[in-house]
Amino acid sequence: MALSKIAALSTILASASLVAGHGYVSSIVANGQNYTGYLADSYPYMSNPPKSVGWATTATDLGFEDGTEYADPNIICHRNGTNAQLSAPVQAGSKVEIQWTPWPDSHHGPVITYLASCNGDCSTVDKSTLEFFKIDAVGLIDDSSVPGTWGTDKLIEAGNRWTVTIPDSIAAGNYVMRHEIIALHSASQKDGAQNYPQCLNLQVTGGGEGVPQGTLGEKLYKDTDPGILVNIYTTLSNYVIPGPALYSG
């Protein structure tokens, strides 16, 4: 594709992102049981919304956080994220299925999942104290054609569903799962990357004795990270997934 056409396509998609729908985690399946997430397009309008395993947010526009908020609490569990009151039990070593609402196919980027121990009750933990370790990440899968195939494309192909395995080595206890899409369609400009962090409470049973070292949510990213400030409308020889290294325990 000619460079002029690539530039034009980038501009069109960046403009479209202002009006295109975005998404959020509507439910998860853990230990074979379905749990409703925080329904950001309906629960905020209820006087007494149902309790959920998903953290509440005020992102009723289904919008995003960007690089200007990487040192702000909003990047941790989305806009004004507030503790979920329920937790989903899950066996260490088992899989959790995460269901998103329909994700726009123009919003290419990585899908990343973290855990953080609450060291107690996740319904009351101070989110600014949570230290996240990365348990799953899929970025650029294939770049044989611009803009490439990404984790988001894999998610869409699976019916807007993502499956992640809880490490079998981590200690039993209460954890916040921070599951996130970073859309890169406008990321060639500083603060153009769009973060969609979603937090959910898990009660991990079984497991080992692992207590992975984590990173505070407000220190996960910098707006100049190579996986954040990147032009996906050029051929990429390599893509570095943002955030700390993947937990290998």
From Swiss-Prot:
O2 binds at H185, Q194. Binds 1 copper ion per subunit. It is an enzyme of class 1 (oxidoreductase). Its cofactor is Cu(2+). The catalytically essential N-terminal histidine His-22 is post-translationally modified by methylation to prevent protonation of the histidine side chain, and protect the critical active site of the enzyme from oxidative damage. GO terms for cellular component: extracellular region. The modification Methylhistidine is found at H22. InterPro entries: AA9 (IPR049892), AA9_LPMO (IPR005103). GO terms for molecular function: metal ion binding; monooxygenase activity. Disulfide bonds join C77-C199, C118-C122. It comes from the Eukaryota. GO terms for biological process: cellulose catabolic process. Its EC number is 1.14.99.56. Lignocellulose is the most abundant polymeric composite on Earth and is a recalcitrant but promising renewable substrate for industrial biotechnology applications. Together with cellobiose dehydrogenases (CDHs) an enzymatic system capable of oxidative cellulose cleavage is formed, which increases the efficiency of cellulases and put LPMOs at focus of biofuel research. Its main location: secreted. Cu(2+) binds at H22, H107, Y196. Glycans are attached at N34, N80. It holds the Pfam family AA9. Keywords: Carbohydrate metabolism, Cellulose degradation, Copper, Disulfide bond, Glycoprotein, Metal-binding, Methylation, Monooxygenase, Oxidoreductase, Polysaccharide degradation, Secreted, Signal. It is found in: Secreted. It catalyses: [(1->4)-beta-D-glucosyl]n+m + reduced acceptor + O2 = 4-dehydro-beta-D-glucosyl-[(1->4)-beta-D-glucosyl]n-1 + [(1->4)-beta-D-glucosyl]m + acceptor + H2O. CDD domains: LPMO_AA9. Belongs to the polysaccharide monooxygenase AA9 family. Lytic polysaccharide monooxygenase (LPMO) that exhibits a mixed C1/C4 oxidative cleavage activity on cellulose and xyloglucan. Catalysis by LPMOs requires the reduction of the active-site copper from Cu(II) to Cu(I) by a reducing agent and H(2)O(2) or O(2) as a cosubstrate. Shows a higher boosting effect with cellulases on the enzymatic saccharification of complex lignocellulosic substrates associated with xyloglucan than on the lignocellulosic substrates without xyloglucan. Has a modular structure: an endo-beta-1,4-glucanase catalytic module at the N-terminus, a linker rich in serines and threonines, and a C-terminal carbohydrate-binding module (CBM). This is AA9 family lytic polysaccharide monooxygenase A. It comes from Penicillium parvum (Eupenicillium parvum). The gene is LPMO9A.
